[in-house]
């Protein structure tokens, strides 16, 4: 009987995959531009049509989407992967801001926080996106900053604001009113019943336009003096981070109670660094380093490579259980071992990403029931080293590299026992908002072979605008911890980058770019990207089918974003989010394995993706059918 049910499920899976998508796949021969807003995608298309490459177009889309407050602002952060067809290498761009002067555990604890705050001027790291755009454009683009920023500047001068953004402003207006410069920009109808812009109203951001114009003026003045293109863009960069823009930014930050100093801005710079990557069944999958959560997806792929996923059937109970367990194991490692490598000593990334360690972790999966106690493993022996944190792990109740499925309550640190109450209750709306907290993605490719994947964020609504710059500050400080027993590698310190959720992706096959993909959604990002990748590689979906396919989400992890209390971040072992369309018999199986189920119509992103079809010389694009994500190809 079980064999018959399994066969029926596989046949049903094939039938489901054959269903038409809600949005058509995008096709192009010359270029592809995809991001979170239609107007921002149009900005990329305009740059392509003016002769720019994929890096130029990606920078234009990034600038436009920042200007449109697509869950980020100009004061946020930029993380990018770029495939350079000239060197045939994938490049990692780290334009994440850092903790400012004075940002220490003692400082935040003195104010009653268990984590840095999620909103307000104390939540701000230094801005990274302006520097990230300047760096990418200088080294890998072809156009001037003036050309690339032109669409964003046109938007800042006034564009018809979308209902989603306008309503977000109205919803958050009570908080926005606490900050004078945010109130001035975002609430043009103060005193009226609706104080935010209406949908379709021309939304003007004069302060931001002035800031962008100052950067362009610095570039153009340098060119008139005979400076090179590189030197001219550097002049624009310096005006933002060291000149009069920096002066006003810091004045506005400190007036409102923030910590960022002129020295913090002047000392920060974007970094080009080595990628992190693994091979999954002949496909090289690239991520950023462990200051992001990206390697967690690579760890999960290494674990899942030990199983025949295709034979399980797409979203069968066994498949869901296997993916859930692999994600839990990799996220448990993320929550303890990941952090800014520049501040790390003896960080075990080689061990964490080794195939041998993955086999060890795969052997810990119990196929009878969920393991509510999955904790960090011990990757150090796989580097020939001894784990310096064994006493700490044991004090927290963890037994690395052991079957802990029947160990009572060992998932949580002893000092966090208070948050263990109601652990199997379905997550509430506030928890899910923190789990899914959004951003946007930028994906671009061209016929020359340039491929770009960017996951920017920070400065989302309700944001604190820094003085008269029009620039919303980042809120990424909340991703640090204050207690080394939670994660010894991610404790806040001045000049340090927080361990973020932002995670662009590029996959290579047979030495050529194969996929570029990204997603919004906080801690769910690498969960959804993992399943997108498996949907394409294991189940043969197109990029559009894979962006629309139903995924699962685990809540069995420490939240990276959210409240400043321990109970706001607590893991929820066994909590499993499923799509509304999951069949009854799958639900029954999963409940029998100890899962607490919740259901949503949207469980897949929104994901944006590009597939490079070398066989036919074309480019495919996939863009989620949820939200405003949009793509244009030619």
Where are these regions (language model features)?
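Sec-dependent N-terminal signal peptides
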Residues: 4-14
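Noncatalytic scaffold domains of N-terminal-nucleophile
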Residues: 19-42, 46, 52-235, 240-292, ...
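Short, well-structured alpha-helical segments that form the helix of a local strand-helix-strand
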Residues: 55-61, 146-157, 240-243, 249-250, ...
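Active-site rim segments in enzyme catalytic domains, especially the processed small/beta chain
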Residues: 67-92, 109, 251, 259-261, ...
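Internal maturation/activation junctions in enzymes
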Residues: 309-457, 601
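Extended C-terminal subregions enriched in glycine
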Residues: 331, 448, 495-498, 529-530, ...
């Amino acid at each position: 009987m079980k064999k018959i049910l399994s066969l029926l499920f596989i046949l049903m899976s094939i039938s489901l995959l054959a269903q038409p998508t809600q949005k058509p796949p995008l096709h192009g021969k010359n270029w592809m531009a995809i991001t979170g807003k239609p107007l921002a995608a149009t900005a990329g298309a305009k740059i392509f049509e003016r002769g720019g490459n994929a890096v130029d177009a990606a920078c234009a889309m990034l600038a436009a989407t920042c200007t449109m407050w697509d869950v980020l602002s100009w004061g946020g952060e930029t993380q990018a992967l770029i495939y350079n067809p000239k060197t045939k290498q994938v490049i990692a761009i780290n334009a994440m801001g850092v903790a400012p002067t004075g940002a220490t555990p003692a400082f935040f604890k003195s104010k009653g926080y268990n984590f840095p705050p999620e909103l307000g001027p104390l939540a701000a790291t230094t801005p990274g996106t302006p520097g990230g755009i300047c760096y990418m454009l200088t080294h890998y683009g072809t156009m001037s900053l003036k050309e690339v920023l032109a669409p964003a500047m046109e938007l800042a001068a006034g564009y018809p604001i979308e209902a989603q953004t306008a309503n977000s402003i109205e919803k958050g207006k009570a908080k926005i009113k606490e900050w004078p410069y945010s109130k001035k920009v975002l609430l043009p109808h103060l005193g009226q019943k609706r104080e935010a812009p209406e949908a379709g109203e021309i939304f003007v951001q004069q302060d931001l336009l002035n800031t962008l114009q100052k950067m362009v003026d610095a570039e153009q003045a340098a060119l008139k003096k005979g400076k090179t293109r590189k030197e001219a863009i550097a002049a624009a960069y310096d005006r933002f981070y060291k000149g009069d823009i920096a002066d006003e930014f810091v004045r506005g930050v400190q007036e409102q109670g923030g910590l960022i100093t002129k020295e913090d801005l002047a000392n920060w710079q974007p970094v080009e660094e080595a990628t992190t990557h693994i091979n999954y069944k002949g496909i090289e999958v690239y991520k950023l380093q462990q200051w992001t959560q990206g390697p967690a997806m690579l760890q999960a792929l290494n674990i899942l490579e030990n199983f025949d996923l295709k034979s399980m059937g797409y979203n069968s109970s066994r498949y869901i259980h296997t993916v859930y367990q692999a994600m839990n194991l990799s996220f448990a490692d993320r929550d303890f071992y990941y952090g800014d490598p520049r501040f790390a000593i003896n960080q075990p990334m080689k061990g964490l990403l080794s195939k041998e360690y993955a086999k060890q972790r795969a052997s810990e999966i119990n196929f009878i029931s969920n393991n509510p106690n999955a904790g960090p493993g011990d990757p150090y022996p796989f580097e020939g080293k001894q784990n310096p944190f064994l006493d700490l792990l044991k004090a927290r109740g963890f037994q690395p590299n052991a079957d802990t499925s029947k160990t009572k309550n060992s998932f949580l640190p002893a000092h966090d026992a208070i948050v263990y109450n109601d652990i199997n209750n379905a997550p509430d709306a506030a928890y899910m908002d923190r789990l899914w907290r959004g951003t946007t993605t930028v994906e671009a490719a061209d016929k020359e072979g340039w491929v770009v994947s960017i996951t920017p964020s920070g400065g989302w609504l309700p944001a604190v605008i820094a003085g008269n710059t029009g620039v919303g500050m980042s809120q990424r400080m909340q991703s640090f911890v204050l207690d080394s027993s939670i994660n010894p590698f991610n404790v806040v310190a001045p000049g340090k980058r927080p361990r973020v959720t932002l995670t662009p992706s590029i996959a290579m096959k047979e030495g050529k770019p194969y996929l570029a993909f990204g997603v919004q959604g906080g801690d769910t990002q690498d969960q959804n990207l993992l399943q997108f990748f498996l949907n394409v590689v294991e189940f043969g979906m197109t990029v559009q089918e894979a962006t629309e396919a139903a995924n699962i989400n685990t809540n069995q992890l420490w939240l990276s974003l959210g409240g400043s209390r321990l109970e706001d971040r607590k893991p929820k072992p066994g909590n499993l989010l499923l799509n509304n369309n999951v069949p009854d018999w799958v639900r029954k199986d999963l409940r029998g394995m100890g899962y607490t189920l919740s259901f949503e119509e949207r469980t897949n992103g929104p994901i944006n993706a590009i597939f490079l079809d070398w066989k036919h010389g074309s480019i495919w694009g996939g863009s989620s059918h949820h939200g405003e994500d949009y793509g244009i190809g030619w």
